[in-house]
Amino acid sequence: MMKTLVVLAITLAVVSAGKVKFQDCGKGEVESLEVEGCSGDYCVIHKGKKLDLAISVTSNQDSANLKLDIVADINGVQIEVPGVDHDGCHYVKCPIKKGQHFDVKYTYSIPAILPTTKAKIIAKIIGDKGLGGCIVINGEIQD
């Protein structure tokens, strides 16, 4: 679950580790997000580069399965971020328990096919009982 949100954060950063401000679109499950080369409330990521992330999450439900959805919102049009493994259990040992805390480190390669643009990245973790966490990050994708 936590690794899932990490992937979301992946889609926004680059040069030295820092805490990233994000909008919570869930119910406070995500406690912190660190992205290599990024800090504050706006991240710039570069196509073709690797992105290192660390995220802290507390599960809001018991769940045997986790699904990760990550989209880029570009001028109101939501586009699925390519290359994301949607099976959250590949990142976190399932099943998970309500109240369980996760600290996950994740590395993601920013696809070169992404457009150069400003975007909001929306990452959602979905468990057996619905939304397990959600964050929005403001940023920009550059060459």
Curated annotation (Swiss-Prot):
Keywords (alphabetical) are: Allergen, Disulfide bond, Secreted, Signal
Q: Which domain of life is it from?
A: Eukaryota
Database matches in Gene3D superfamilies: 2.60.40.770
Q: List the disulfide bonds.
A: 25-134, 38-43, 89-94
UniProt-listed SMART domains: ML
Output a single Gene Ontology CC term carried by this record: extracellular region
Q: What is its main location?
A: secreted
Output the InterPro entries linked to this UniProt entry. Ig_E-set (IPR014756), ML_dom (IPR003172), NPC2-like (IPR039670)
Q: Name one Pfam family in it.
A: E1_DerP2_DerF2
GO biological process terms held by the UniProt record = sterol transport
Listed GO MF terms: sterol binding
Spell out the subcellular localization from the entry: Secreted
Please give the coiled-coil regions recorded for this protein: none
Q: Which CDD domains match?
A: Der-p2_like
| Signal peptide (from-to) | 1-17
Give the family, as the similarity comment puts it.
Belongs to the NPC2 family.
Q: What is this protein called?
A: Mite group 2 allergen Pso o 2
Q: Give the gene symbol.
A: ALLA
